[in-house]
Curated annotation (Swiss-Prot):
HAMAP family: KaiB. It comes from Trichormus variabilis (strain ATCC 29413 / PCC 7937) (Anabaena variabilis). InterPro entries: Circ_KaiB (IPR013474), KaiB-like (IPR039022), KaiB_domain (IPR011649), Thioredoxin-like_sf (IPR036249). Key component of the KaiABC oscillator complex, which constitutes the main circadian regulator in cyanobacteria. Complex composition changes during the circadian cycle to control KaiC phosphorylation. KaiA stimulates KaiC autophosphorylation, while KaiB sequesters KaiA, leading to KaiC autodephosphorylation. Phospho-Ser-431 KaiC accumulation triggers binding of KaiB to form the KaiB(6):KaiC(6) complex, leading to changes in output regulators CikA and SasA. KaiB switches to a thioredoxin-like fold (KaiB(fs)) when bound to KaiC. Belongs to the KaiB family. The KaiABC complex composition changes during the circadian cycle to control KaiC phosphorylation. Complexes KaiC(6), KaiA(2-4):KaiC(6), KaiB(6):KaiC(6) and KaiC(6):KaiB(6):KaiA(12) are among the most important forms, many form cooperatively. Undergoes a major conformational rearrangment; in the free state forms homotetramers as a dimer of dimers. When bound to the CI domain of KaiC switches to a monomeric thioredoxin-fold (KaiB(fs)). KaiB(fs) binds CikA, leading it to dephosphorylate phospho-RpaA. The lineage of its organism: Bacteria, Bacillati, Cyanobacteriota, Cyanophyceae, Nostocales. Gene3D superfamilies: Glutaredoxin. It holds the Pfam family KaiB. Keywords: Biological rhythms. The keyword Cell membrane does not apply. One of its GO terms (biological process) is circadian rhythm. This is Circadian clock oscillator protein KaiB. Has 2 forms, fold switches to a thioredoxin-like fold (KaiB(fs)) when bound to KaiC.
């Protein structure tokens, strides 16, 4: 995987400016800046202000993180503080490991 060729589109659904929402956003931004700097788009959706968006996307709990692109769509509900859990849940860690394995094998 060449990260430079992919753009990751993510949506974070939160319920207002609660401590859980603030923590989820801060943690997610840290992960994205460390791992995907410059190649991601993050839209934060407050389900209290935009309940129709939550309904359209079938969001039942917050915080919910949804990876829209690249396919397939993946969702993580709840605590986002575990970096590895977030990356695995969104199929992003698997892509990193696959690329590292491929590069290691091709350099032999």
């Amino acid at each position: 995987m060449n990260k430079a060729r992919k753009t990751y589109v993510l949506k974070l659904y939160v319920a207002g400016n609660t401590p859980n929402s603030v923590r989820a956003l801060k943690t997610l931004k840290n992960i994205l800046e460390q791992e995907f700097q410059g190649i991601y788009a993050l839209k934060v959706i407050d389900v209290l202000k935009n309940p129709q968006l939550a309904e359209e996307d079938k969001i039942l709990a917050t915080p919910t993180l949804s990876k829209i692109l690249p396919p397939p769509v993946r969702k993580i509900i709840g605590d986002l503080s575990d970096r590895e859990r977030v990356l695995i849940g969104l199929d992003l860690l698997y892509e990193e490991l696959t690329e590292e394995d491929w590069e290691a094998q091709s350099s032999l």
